[in-house]
Amino acid sequence: MVKTVIFGHKNPDTDTICSSIAYADLKTKLGHEVAPVRLGEVNLETQFALDKFNIHAPELIERVEDGAEVILVDHNEFQQSVDNIENATIREVIDHHRISNFETKEPLYFRAEPVGCTATILNKMYKENDISVDKNIAGILLSAIISDSLLLKSPTCTEEDVQAAHELAEIAGVDLESYGLDMLKAGADLSDKTVKDLITMDAKEFAMGNAKVEIAQVNAVDTNEIYKLHDKLVEVITSRINDNDLDLFLFVVTDILNNDSEVLAIGNGKDKVNAAFNVTLDSTNRALLKGVVSRKKQIVTVLTEQFK
């Protein structure tokens, strides 16, 4: 690998894939030799967006060469990145998450903004560099914003995200509401997923105090369909906890129509889950989290406080 590679986090979501592609497009137009890559399989929601705007998914990688120059988008925490990230040379980070478990040997360009989506930052960066966004890139940037903001309904969604979404929808030539709902529904089709798929397709590991916590989130139209698999979910999650030396695993199923989530908590620290969300996990270790849709803003932040 000679070029600088651009990638997002493991278990990639739509923002991670689309922002990697879009930032590679911008950097290339600015004269840099870069290539987008990915650290996992493309989910149905993301594939829907890529197909809509005639864009191929980036190459899949598992490692980068030692010393390779890399740019991180949509993440910065090393446990969410490529396995040997400590041996890479990180040149840039473009992100919208908390900054944690991150260090470099050399100075770098680090841009983190409190917006709902990395794509919103990239849309600004096109403007700052006087580079026009073409129709297909506008489409995938829009798709990323729709995904991260649950069609502009998430509490992480800012006015900047809203403005960017409307602007990009016009460039892409799509109706924001109808396209957005179609895309989210495509992602919520979990009929062909195994239980292992469900708990890994959008899972992120977090350091909370001295605890290792993994939080997996899936979007669904009918949460009850997912939890018909309760016993198997518990079995597979317990195995994952043991294999990865985790303290706690949260499996969050978000109802994209009602904007609520149901959580299944397995491992140590279930009392902290109760305290964080002012709920009581039932005998099956589940609870309804009313109005909770954002892992970043409504789950990670409040749960981290309980582990301090």
Curated annotation (Swiss-Prot):
<dbReference type="GO" id="GO:0030145">
    <property type="term" value="F:manganese ion binding"/>
</dbReference>
<keyword id="KW-0479">Metal-binding</keyword>
<keyword id="KW-0963">Cytoplasm</keyword>
<keyword id="KW-0378">Hydrolase</keyword>
<keyword id="KW-0464">Manganese</keyword>
<feature type="binding site">
    <location>
        <position position="15"/>
    </location>
    <ligand>
        <name>Mn(2+) 2</name>
    </ligand>
</feature>
<feature type="binding site">
    <location>
        <position position="9"/>
    </location>
    <ligand>
        <name>Mn(2+) 1</name>
    </ligand>
</feature>
<dbReference type="InterPro" id="IPR022934">
    <property type="entry name" value="Mn-dep_inorganic_PyrPase"/>
</dbReference>
<dbReference type="InterPro" id="IPR004097">
    <property type="entry name" value="DHHA2"/>
</dbReference>
<feature type="binding site">
    <location>
        <position position="74"/>
    </location>
    <ligand>
        <name>Mn(2+) 2</name>
    </ligand>
</feature>
<feature type="binding site">
    <location>
        <position position="13"/>
    </location>
    <ligand>
        <name>Mn(2+) 1</name>
    </ligand>
</feature>
<dbReference type="InterPro" id="IPR001667">
    <property type="entry name" value="DDH_dom"/>
</dbReference>
<dbReference type="GO" id="GO:0005737">
    <property type="term" value="C:cytoplasm"/>
</dbReference>
<protein>
    <recommendedName>
        <fullName>Probable manganese-dependent inorganic pyrophosphatase</fullName>
        <ecNumber>3.6.1.1</ecNumber>
    </recommendedName>
</protein>
<feature type="binding site">
    <location>
        <position position="96"/>
    </location>
    <ligand>
        <name>Mn(2+) 2</name>
    </ligand>
</feature>
<dbReference type="GO" id="GO:0004427">
    <property type="term" value="F:inorganic diphosphate phosphatase activity"/>
</dbReference>
<feature type="binding site">
    <location>
        <position position="74"/>
    </location>
    <ligand>
        <name>Mn(2+) 1</name>
    </ligand>
</feature>
<feature type="binding site">
    <location>
        <position position="148"/>
    </location>
    <ligand>
        <name>Mn(2+) 2</name>
    </ligand>
</feature>
<dbReference type="Pfam" id="PF02833">
    <property type="entry name" value="DHHA2"/>
</dbReference>
<dbReference type="Pfam" id="PF01368">
    <property type="entry name" value="DHH"/>
</dbReference>
<dbReference type="InterPro" id="IPR038222">
    <property type="entry name" value="DHHA2_dom_sf"/>
</dbReference>
<comment type="similarity">
    <text>Belongs to the PPase class C family.</text>
</comment>
<dbReference type="InterPro" id="IPR038763">
    <property type="entry name" value="DHH_sf"/>
</dbReference>
